[in-house]
Amino acid sequence: MIRNIGSNLMKSSSSILLRNQQQQTNKLLFRNFTSIPEAVAVTSEESYNSKNQFTPIGKDSFAVVHISGKQYKVIEGDIIMTDKIQVDVGEHIVLDKVLLVGTKNETIIGKPIISNFKVHAYIEEQAKTEHVTIFKHKPRKNYKRTTGFQGLATYIRIGGIIKGQETTTTTN
């Protein structure tokens, strides 16, 4: 029995070429959509300290803060849910681990923390999270276990992003 292998080989190679061309065009489209606009300036903390022109206080500024091992992007007026923090409801807290601050025009990136920006926040609620049901089973062994979990959470309202004085230490 003789088969015509050459035509199948040509079909598969042409489909591979077509697929490669599609992947290349998809990469080009992806690059166009994910490129950083030229109007946005990314600034490190060192160059910011030399310029001292950046004041992102207001509704249009955002910050990335570090709270109990996780990072959150916050804007003034946001309510975020974090893991339980041992603080009473209604208390004012200051988040001083600010990793990034930015507006539409400029961004400051800390290495790793920006020392002279702080985020003021208020504890809104201490509550339990949504119930998660965990079901384990082993097929054909009549083994079924159902357990559940409900974690504790803290809801925090962001008051504002404040530019503070630079912290300098003096030694005597």
UniProtKB/Swiss-Prot annotation:
> Record's InterPro entries?
bL21-like, bL21-like_sf, Ribosomal_bL21
The Gene Ontology biological process terms listed for this entry are: translation
Q: Please indicate which superkingdom the organism of origin belongs to.
A: Eukaryota
Principal localisation: mitochondrion
The record's subcellular locations are: Mitochondrion
Q: Where is the transit peptide?
A: 1-20
Q: Which UniProt keywords apply?
A: Mitochondrion, Ribonucleoprotein, Ribosomal protein, Transit peptide
Annotated Gene Ontology cellular components are: mitochondrial large ribosomal subunit
Name any one GO molecular function. Answer: RNA binding
Alphabetized Pfam families for the sequence = Ribosomal_L21p
Q: Which family does it belong to?
A: Belongs to the bacterial ribosomal protein bL21 family.
Q: What is this protein called?
A: Large ribosomal subunit protein bL21m
Organism in which the protein naturally occurs: Dictyostelium discoideum (Social amoeba)
